[in-house]
A protein has these predicted regions:
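A surface-exposed partner-binding patch
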Residues: 1-193, 200
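A recognition module on extended beta-rich or small alphabeta surfaces enriched in W/G with H and D/E
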Residues: 178-180, 186-235
Length: 235
C-alpha cells in the first residue's frame, strides 16, 4: 500500500489540536502499543495488516452483524496503527480503511485500545448483547467513523443518559413508557437518527430516535447491521 494512503487517512482524522502519528514496522513506538496490535504495525503488506486485525474480532460479534461483516471484509483495504496525542495524553487507535463512501472520501472506522479505557463499567453496559459487550471489553471500547459518534458504538467513557437533553419533549418519553435517565444514545447516522439502548428493556433491543420522537423498540442486531452497511452510502 502506497505511503500516500497514510496521508489520506491523516487528512480525514486530523484537525483541531490533536497530533496523529502512524506506528509502523521499525518504529520505536512498537513497544508502547498493545501486544496484539504489534503484528499489524509490523506487517509488510496491507493484506497482512487486515488479516491480523480481523483475527482479533470475535466470531460472535461478526455473526451478530453478518451483512456488515461481509461488506466490511470485502471492502477492507488496509488497517493502520496511529498514536493520538492531545494535551499531554497519548492513546493508540486502529484505523480501518474500508473502501469509499458515495461522497468519494475513504470509509474509515476508528477502533480504540482496550488498555487505555480499562474494563468498561458504564451504567448502560449491560444493555448490549453479550457479543457486543465482549467486543467492547477485548477488541475496541469504541468503534465508530472518524467523528467518534456515528456508524458504530461510541466509547463508553462518553456514554450518558438522555436526562437533561432538550431534544425530546416529555411526552415522547411517556409514549414509550420510559424516563430520560433510562435511555442512552450509543451511535447515529450522518444526520439526526439516533440509536438508543434502554435500561428498562432486555438486552438485544434498540430504540431509534428522530426529530423528537421515538420508534417502538426493535431488534438491536438487525438495526445496527443495517446502519453500519449504510456507511458506504454516505453522500
Amino acid at each position: 500500500v502506497a505511503e500516500c494512503e497514510v496521508d489520506d487517512i491523516l487528512a480525514e482524522v486530523s484537525g483541531g489540536e490533536a497530533r496523529w502519528t502512524p506506528v509502523a514496522a521499525g518504529s520505536t513506538e512498537l513497544a508502547q502499543i498493545p501486544q496484539n496490535w504489534r503484528p499489524i504495525a509490523s506487517a509488510a503488506t496491507a493484506t497482512e495488516r487486515c488479516r491480523h486485525a480481523l483475527s482479533l474480532w470475535g466470531s460472535d460479534f461478526m455473526a451478530l452483524l453478518p451483512r456488515f461483516t461481509r461488506r466490511f471484509q470485502d471492502e477492507l483495504t488496509d488497517v493502520r496503527v496511529f498514536r493520538r496525542e492531545l494535551g499531554g495524553l497519548s492513546e493508540h487507535v486502529l484505523i480501518y480503511v474500508a473502501g469509499q463512501a458515495r461522497d468519494g472520501f475513504p470509509a474509515l472506522w476508528l477502533g480504540w485500545d482496550p488498555a487505555v479505557l480499562g474494563q468498561p463499567e458504564a451504567e448502560f453496559f449491560g444493555c448490549f448483547p453479550a457479543a457486543v459487550q465482549a467486543f467492547l471489553r477485548y477488541v475496541h471500547p469504541g468503534f465508530t467513523a472518524q467523528d467518534w459518534q456515528s456508524y458504530g458504538i461510541r466509547r463508553p467513557d462518553t456514554w450518558e443518559s438522555l436526562d437533561g437533553y432538550d431534544w425530546f419533549p416529555r411526552e415522547s418519553f411517556a409514549a414509550i413508557r420510559s424516563e430520560p435517565s433510562q435511555l442512552m444514545w450509543f451511535t447515529k447516522d450522518s444526520g439526526q437518527l439516533y440509536y438508543c439502548v434502554n435500561s428498562s428493556l432486555p438486552s438485544g433491543r434498540v430504540t431509534l430516535a428522530y426529530e423528537g420522537s421515538f420508534d417502538p423498540p426493535s431488534d438491536f442486531a438487525a438495526e445496527l447491521d443495517e446502519l453500519l452497511r449504510r456507511r458506504w452510502d454516505e453522500q
